Amino acid sequence: MSSVGIASASLWLRGPVKSALKGRWLSCEQMRRYGTKSAPAVRKGGHSKKARQAPSLPFVFGRHKQLTGPEFTRRTRIGNLSDKITKFEQLKLLPEVREVMMKVIASESVLNKSLDDEDCGLDDKRVAAFLGQVQPTPIQTAVIKKMAKTLMEPQLQVHMVAAETGSGKTMSYLMPLVDYLKQEEQAAGTEEGRARLGALRSLILVPTHELVEQVYMTLEKLQEPLQLKTFKLDRDTPYKDIVEAFKGRVDIMVTTPGKLRGLFKIRMLHRPDRILSQVRFAVVDEADTLMDQSWVQETYSCIKSLRDANHLVFCSASVPMEFEKAMNKLFPNLQVVASEKLHRINKHSNIKIINVALRPYNGSKMKALAQALYAIMKDGTSEGYEKRCVVFVNEADSVNSIVDTLRDKFGHDVHGLTGEHSLDDRLATIAPFMRSPPRIQDQVRPSELKKPQERRLPNSNIKVADSKDNGQRSVSSPLKVLVTTDVLSRGINFKGVKHVILYDVPAKSIDLVHRVGRTSRMNERGHVYIFVGKKGSAQAKGLNPVVKKNRPIQ
């Protein structure tokens, strides 16, 4: 919501109304009751109709407000930067960095429809063909432009990057990071000068080993074209590999706070404190997780080890109120770059509510799940490609029973994943979902069939093709299903996942934002199915208007 909207709302509240509300956000009913009655007279032609409309108020999901409201995003104004800057060439980056990073984006983008489940190198013709369509996202434009102004200045600069899921945040911090490293090399001049840059030059901290793997897959693509040494420190990294890596030079390392602190326990490693003191650029990704009560001591201990850092970047898709308070207390000079779409569900997400308390489900979520998966298979979309669906549950104990039922009773290609699985199992399970969907050669194409009649599934707003379409075969696509908990709701860049099912309604608004954010990434269209019962159905049904009106979740 704009600052003009806030000011207008404040002017509308007069006398006892303003004092009674004590500065709280108004509900829609309160706005209808008080807003228009106390509105000042508008001269003819003095204000547009749009200016007189009530501001877009946050939608409180759950029992309590958790996320920061629109006042947080007003700390920095991205404004119309994305309208003025539409090409990476307009941003201040070294030419070699710009060229390589654009190729990386083209090789990973969910918008590049020519990609399939095969690994794609930067010199692949499919990458070259897509380069003309690669443009900076609003958050990338804002972050690169802001950091470029003082990128090489020696004092500590602390930034917070906050933007909606699927907006390109990883590249928004990677581009300044890589640009910093290459400019530092240029300033060092000779090979001898570059050798003195430090054993560890930059660091990326993430909360899970799945994210370590995901970020490292991107970093690997930078090694050869930019001559950068990248390294991942995860649960399975042998001690000898760690020691060997630091004998030379590591330009970028990605790890978790726990593994970083573990360096001090390796007797073979000489003076890990000295190694960490050489870091000049550090990123804390999924920062709201790494700075919450269960992680903050470990994370902050890592940060304090970086005694000579020039840049410290915190990156997050959600900003809880407690997180904002902690950051302001720890870093008084914090510079915020926040998207105006923060905490908003992507408008391309189609929210579908299924009341499992009603017939024909009669309280059976499993019946509703089987019906929803059937509808996804038969909806006639993703012609020629495998479909993917992620099912979120609240409790890890539910995963195995759901997987067994879907596989044994309904014959689905389904996989389950919780934090209790080993790292190797987790990585193997999510690997297909992190690659682009494969082509299906023998699929019946919808264009070859008569257009089927649509019917609505009972007690839901889901429409599917009628399988009784005059004896014609209904359109069906292979479907791969992943059942998981919130362990995979954050940061994972699922590719080709256009369907997300909330088997259990999350208790917290922050979990809702992250679960829904696994689809509709980079403004791609996606579908979200929410199962509700007698309780909570009214609030869940309010999500569709929230999405259409672009209201933030709080």
Curated annotation (Swiss-Prot):
Binding, ATP: A163, E164, T165, G166, S167, G168, K169, T170
Keyword Nucleotide-binding carried by entry: yes
Sample GO molecular function, one term: RNA helicase activity
Compositionally biased region (Basic and acidic residues): 445-457
GO cellular component: mitochondrial matrix; nucleolus
Keywords: ATP-binding, Helicase, Hydrolase, Mitochondrion, Nucleotide-binding, RNA-binding, Transit peptide
Motif DEAD box in this chain: 285-288
Catalytic reaction list: ATP + H2O = ADP + phosphate + H(+)
Broad EC category: hydrolase
Database matches in Gene3D superfamilies: P-loop containing nucleotide triphosphate hydrolases
PROSITE patterns: HELICASE_ATP_BIND_1, HELICASE_CTER
Location in the cell: Mitochondrion
InterPro entries from the UniProt entry: DEAD/DEAH_box_helicase_dom, Helicase_ATP-bd, Helicase_C-like, P-loop_NTPase
Any Pfam family: Helicase_C
Sequence ranges assigned to domain Helicase ATP-binding in this UniProt record: 150-337
Organelle targeting peptide span: 1-54
Taxonomic superkingdom: Eukaryota
Motif Q motif per UniProt: ranges: 119-140
Domain Helicase C-terminal: 368-554
One GO term (biological process): maturation of LSU-rRNA from tricistronic rRNA transcript (SSU-rRNA, 5.8S rRNA, LSU-rRNA)
Enzyme nomenclature, EC number: 3.6.4.13
SUPFAM superfamilies hit by this protein: P-loop containing nucleoside triphosphate hydrolases
Family named by the database record: Belongs to the DEAD box helicase family. MRH4 subfamily.
Record text about domains: The Q motif is unique to and characteristic of the DEAD box family of RNA helicases and controls ATP binding and hydrolysis.
Name listed for the protein in its UniProt record: ATP-dependent RNA helicase MRH4, mitochondrial
